[in-house]
């Protein structure tokens, strides 16, 4: 495995859209008791359900610690799911795993961004995070893929979405937050994104979803469904703290053009809830110094936008909410050639994210 000192763009690589063919999807097995209630057992059942749903469409590799390997292997009893032993600090592989890039000659490489647990010592969610910062490298070594490392640039995969044709969507709330890359200007951040993902146009939404503890990851708020079309979390309730965020994002999207000069078509996705953790759910989480405590009075950042596109399928969260059926119908309408599979997402949400956050697609090699 090589470690190029150049950039993906200079070497002819780009980040593909999520709907381009996958070789597999990666996940990490949850166990951290100060984030996942009841020793992680309810979350493990939820992750297993997601893995098995994905495995209907493509191979899945789940990374588990030495202490959880045997348990994970037993619970993931599907021939299309591989379990490998990798140590980590938590289970958010979208943010800790590599961002894969491809060229037109059949090669796949990975970008290994710096990781600081969503803010380091200024708002980060736990410490230490060293093992999480090593996850991308370990995955790339297992796959024997070349690795581009950005030691001086922090980024989480959930903070970006691309259309595969030169346009990236992100949020100012996250990427311009002083707890990520305070030494860089917006222009310098854009230059890094262009160099490592081979994008031309960057659309900056002001904020992500209200109370998203990642500082507003775009993958919980707005995503591409095809070139020129996006899906935006939405509420018409003017008393909802998300209302102004949705309105501001819509204005930016309607005024933007992508790298191909297209105006964007915006599809609206209702926001579930409002959703809250119960006192019992919060009491099941260990209280540990350096970790974020759970509070039943704080609204959860639930979103149907936090889904994964797989080969021929859409794996999306449900919340036992009246809007679940509408969300499924919208996803089926915007993805008419995919099968929409809804998987219970509450346990994942209680930990701070959802299906897109706990998965990382590895694109299939392609030749022009």
Curated annotation (Swiss-Prot):
Its EC number is 3.5.3.12. One of its GO terms (biological process) is putrescine biosynthetic process from arginine. The keyword Magnesium does not apply. Disulfide bonds: none annotated. The keyword Hydrolase applies. NCBIfam families: agmatine_aguA, PRK13551.1. This is Agmatine deiminase. The lineage of its organism: Bacteria, Pseudomonadati, Pseudomonadota, Gammaproteobacteria, Pseudomonadales. The gene is aguA.
């Amino acid at each position: 495995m090589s470690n190029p000192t150049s950039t993906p763009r200079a070497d002819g690589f780009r980040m593909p859209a999520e709907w381009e063919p996958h070789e597999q999807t990666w996940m990490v097995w949850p166990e951290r008791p100060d984030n996942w209630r009841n020793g992680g057992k309810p979350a493990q059942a939820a992750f297993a359900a997601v893995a098995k749903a994905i495995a209907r469409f493509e191979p899945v590799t789940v990374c588990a610690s030495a202490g959880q390997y045997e348990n994970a292997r037993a619970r993931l009893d599907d021939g299309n799911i591989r379990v490998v032993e990798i140590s980590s600090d938590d289970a958010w592989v979208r943010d800790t795993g590599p961002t894969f890039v491809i060229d037109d000659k059949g090669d796949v490489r990975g970008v290994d961004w710096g990781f600081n647990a969503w803010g380091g010592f200024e708002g980060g969610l736990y410490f230490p995070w060293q093992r999480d910062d090593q996850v991308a490298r370990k995955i790339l070594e297992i796959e024997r893929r070349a690795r581009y490392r950005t030691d001086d640039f922090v980024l989480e995969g959930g903070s970006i979405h691309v259309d595969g044709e030169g346009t990236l969507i992100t949020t100012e709330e996250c990427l311009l937050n002083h707890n990520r890359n305070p030494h860089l200007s917006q222009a310098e951040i854009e230059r890094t994104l262009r160099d490592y993902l081979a994008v031309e146009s960057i659309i900056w939404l002001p904020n992500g979803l209200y109370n998203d503890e990642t500082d507003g990851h775009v993958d919980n708020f707005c995503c591409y469904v095809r070139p020129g079309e996006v899906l935006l979390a939405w509420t018409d309730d003017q008393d909802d703290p998300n209302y102004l965020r949705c309105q501001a994002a819509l204005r930016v999207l309607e005024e933007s053009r992508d790298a191909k000069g297209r105006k964007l078509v915006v599809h609206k996705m209702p926001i579930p809830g409002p959703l809250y953790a119960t006192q019992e759910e919060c009491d099941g989480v260990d209280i540990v110094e350096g970790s974020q405590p759970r509070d039943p009075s704080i609204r959860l950042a639930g979103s149907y936008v936090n889904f994964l596109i797989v080969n021929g399928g859409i794996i999306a969260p449900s919340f036992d909410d009246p809007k679940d059926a509408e969300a499924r119908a919208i996803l089926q309408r915007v993805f008419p050639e995919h099968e929409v599979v809804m998987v219970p997402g509450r346990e994942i949400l209680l930990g701070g994210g959802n299906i897109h956050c706990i998965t990382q697609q590895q694109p299939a090699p392609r030749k022009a």
